[in-house]
Amino acid sequence: MAAELAMGAELPSSPLAIEYVNDFDLMKFEVKKEPPEAERFCHRLPPGSLSSTPLSTPCSSVPSSPSFCAPSPGTGGGGGAGGGGGSSQAGGAPGPPSGGPGAVGGTSGKPALEDLYWMSGYQHHLNPEALNLTPEDAVEALIGSGHHGAHHGAHHPAAAAAYEAFRGPGFAGGGGADDMGAGHHHGAHHAAHHHHAAHHHHHHHHHHGGAGHGGGAGHHVRLEERFSDDQLVSMSVRELNRQLRGFSKEEVIRLKQKRRTLKNRGYAQSCRFKRVQQRHILESEKCQLQSQVEQLKLEVGRLAKERDLYKEKYEKLAGRGGPGSAGGAGFPREPSPPQAGPGGAKGTADFFL
């Protein structure tokens, strides 16, 4: 993994190389199909060996990467060092590209561009029928190996296994040389798919973050659903604190805030109901008082009429009694009988006088 990180750090920084890496697409290369005879011959070859005859097959030989630098002493005359005990092929046949440390040292100047050229040639010599893989499967295996190998290491062995299956048995060399070649190839592939891997990595972490947030939200929902609204309102503070032991502070604060909101809402509804009830009571009392006022007005009118009648009768009686009393005073009274004797005559004369 340290070799992979080292190769990823040695990527070219020139604008031309970066533009070439970004424009590189593996899907534009087609896979060459070999006849069944070549496939059977390929299966008869021992793993890890190289063919020294002109009848080389895709499983036994791969094209060498074009070199931008002078070959190092560790490289063969055919253009690449042999891997795992192999030698350079006769007649200028190219050797495997990742034979050993010498090959890596010989191409240390432009490792990314050389590996990209080698990958373009390697796609033409791969036999998909022997591996039962399609170009899409190969690209997916490379993408999965580049992303998970750089960020997760040994936690994803499936991607590494898919990458090994994509390489094929004829490409396998020595232990140390094969590891170095894999690191070199992975560095070039990481440069070719840097943008896609970064985008996939961003979505991967976003997915994990969303999953964690969803889990926390589910825990909060379970805590809030543990108590109904009626229980939260009717429960005492001491009982609620006893029930909330063992939960986080944020969850407790959220639940208490919900309880406070419910209590305030209930108090507001109670006040609103009381106001409405009092308004209805006052309106009914107002209607009763207004009806009583109308009845009192009618009673006042009736009493006023009765008063006027009694007053008129009194005036009539008073007017009739005044003239009768004045005429009665002028009526002659009856004379008293005359008295005998001289005193009687004198009294009568005094009476008339």
Curated annotation (Swiss-Prot):
Residues 46-73 have a biased composition (Low complexity). Belongs to the bZIP family. Maf subfamily. InterPro entries: bZIP (IPR004827), bZIP_Maf (IPR004826), bZIP_sf (IPR046347), Maf_TF_N (IPR013592), TF_DNA-bd_sf (IPR008917), Transcription_factor_Maf_fam (IPR024874). This is Transcription factor MafA. Forms homodimers or heterodimers. Monomers and dimers are able to bind DNA, but the off-rate is faster for monomers. Interacts with NEUROD1 and PDX1. May interact with MAFB, FOS, JUN and PCAF. It is found in: Nucleus. Changing residue 64 to F: In INSDM; may prevent phosphorylation at S-65; may enhance protein stability. Transcription factor that activates insulin gene expression. Acts synergistically with NEUROD1/BETA2 and PDX1. Binds the insulin enhancer C1/RIPE3b element. Binds to consensus TRE-type MARE 5'-TGCTGACTCAGCA-3' DNA sequence. Residues 40-108, 177-219, 315-353 are annotated as: Disordered. Residues 254-279 are annotated as: Basic motif. One of its GO terms (cellular component) is chromatin. Expressed in the islets of Langerhans (at protein level). It is linked to Insulinomatosis and diabetes mellitus: An autosomal dominant disorder characterized by the occurrence of multicentric insulinomas, hyperinsulinemic hypoglycemia, non insulin-dependent diabetes mellitus, and impaired glucose tolerance. Some patients also exhibit congenital cataract and/or congenital glaucoma. The modification Phosphothreonine is found at residues 53, 57. GO terms for molecular function: DNA binding; DNA-binding transcription activator activity, RNA polymerase II-specific; DNA-binding transcription factor activity; DNA-binding transcription factor activity, RNA polymerase II-specific; RNA polymerase II cis-regulatory region sequence-specific DNA binding; sequence-specific double-stranded DNA binding. Signal peptide: none annotated. The modification Phosphoserine is found at residues 14, 49, 61, 65. CDD domains: bZIP_Maf_large. Keywords: Activator, Diabetes mellitus, Disease variant, DNA-binding, Isopeptide bond, Nucleus, Phosphoprotein, Transcription, Transcription regulation, Ubl conjugation. It comes from Homo sapiens. Residues 254-317 form the bZIP domain. One of its GO terms (biological process) is regulation of DNA-templated transcription. Residues 74-93, 319-330 have a biased composition (Gly residues). PROSITE patterns: BZIP. Residues 282-303 are annotated as: Leucine-zipper.
